């Protein structure tokens, strides 16, 4: 019984360590956004919409999800849709969190 607990403890520690290491890095992901949105998020992408700077993480996440599924955005949304649909929810949340702190 003691041996099983030791093995389970080791497995749990490894699992938590791996998931922490695999956590999405919003700052690293945002680097692909800098060209249109600016390093500090204050740039109006393609001259339309709002700058990401100053927006709340939950709103940014909703917008990213909307771009990914095509339910959000204006006439130029195809650019964002094609970029964002490759990201997981975890990555979009990490980006939204990072952008909300710009």
UniProtKB/Swiss-Prot annotation:
Q: From which residue to which does the signal peptide run?
A: 1-23
Q: Which InterPro entries match?
A: Cyt_c-like_dom, Cyt_c-like_dom_sf, Cyt_C_IC
PTM per UniProt? Binds 1 heme c group covalently per subunit.
Please tell me one Gene Ontology term that the record gives under cellular component. Answer: periplasmic space
Q: Which residues bind heme c?
A: 33, 36-37, 80
Localization = Periplasm
MF-aspect GO terms: electron transfer activity; heme binding; iron ion binding
Disulfide partners: none
Which keywords has UniProt assigned to this entry? Answer: Electron transport, Heme, Iron, Metal-binding, Periplasm, Signal, Transport
Q: Name one Pfam family in it.
A: Cytochrom_C
Q: What does this protein do?
A: Natural electron acceptor for a formate dehydrogenase.
- Identify this protein by name: Cytochrome c-553
């Amino acid at each position: 019984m003691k041996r099983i607990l030791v093995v389970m403890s080791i497995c749990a520690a490894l699992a938590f360590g791996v998931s922490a290491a695999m956590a999405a890095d919003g700052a690293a992901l945002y680097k692909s956004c800098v060209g249109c949105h600016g390093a500090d998020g204050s740039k109006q992408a393609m001259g339309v919409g709002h700058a990401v700077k100053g927006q709340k993480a939950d709103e940014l996440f909703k917008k990213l999800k909307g771009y990914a599924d095509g339910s959000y955005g204006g006439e130029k949304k195809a650019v964002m849709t094609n970029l964002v649909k490759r990201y997981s929810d975890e990555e979009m949340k990490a980006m939204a969190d990072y952008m909300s702190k710009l």
